[in-house]
Amino acid sequence: MTRDKIIITGASSGLGEGMAREFAARGRSLGLAARRIDKLDALAAQLADDAGRVVVRALDVTDTDDVPRAFAELAEGLGGVDRVIVNAGLGKGAPIGTGNAAANLETVQTNLVGALAQAEAAMAIFRAQNHGHLVLISSISAVRGLPKAQAAYSASKAGVSALGQGLQAELAGSPIKVSVILPGYIETDINRGVKTKLMTETDAGVRAMVAAIESERRRSEVPAWPWKPIAAALRHLPDAVSAKLI
């Protein structure tokens, strides 16, 4: 099934922007949301010739009351919605108990509470129309609790994965599909400064993500190589080894 009308959050930069460009190249209609409306307006202008239709809406996903309003407005602008990609996220974080609780709380509020608010809004639409595809962008970091500055981030993404798994169990056999995507290291602003041999170039990473989304598999590590075997290994490796991998 082709999902022609797609909402993407966190679409002003990084993987969200990359997915918007890739889906636009496939002729899809896009509802793009992010905090930086100026960047969304500029992106929409660039995509106008390829995409079926592009509508934008400023949205801070931590404003949980505004999320359903934003989704309703975007769906109206698109003439409906077939897929929602819950992508908006934050990579801040600090070692727990070091006086930087605000950064960790903001990370969890954005990545997990914001994702829940988006899932609520998307699922309300999908339940009403009895079809749709909810895509939750998690992370390889969700597979294993990570130390230091990544502790809150990995916990927030583990929550996103668990949310997706719960919905999959509930919706099994229904016309509403749920996919959980776990990206590894892909070149974006959030990963700038990370030194690893496992980094994937942006365009290749985005293509892998879009291919996984289009497949509508329940769970996809992307790119599959090397992240699928790494994800499997992370569940069993000693802490010292897993921390070095991711």
Predicted feature locations:
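Rossmann-fold cofactor-recognition segment
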Residues: 47-65
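Conserved glycine-rich cofactor-binding loop
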Residues: 12-13
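Substrate-binding pocket helix/loop in short-chain dehydrogenase/reductase
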Residues: 95-108
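Conserved glycine-rich Rossmann-like NAD(P)H-binding loop of the short-chain dehydrogenase/reductase
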Residues: 26-43
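Active-site helix of classical SDR
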Residues: 119, 156
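C-terminal helical subdomain
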Residues: 173, 180, 195-232
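Residue(s) in the substrate-gating loop at a strand-loop-helix junction
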Residues: 139
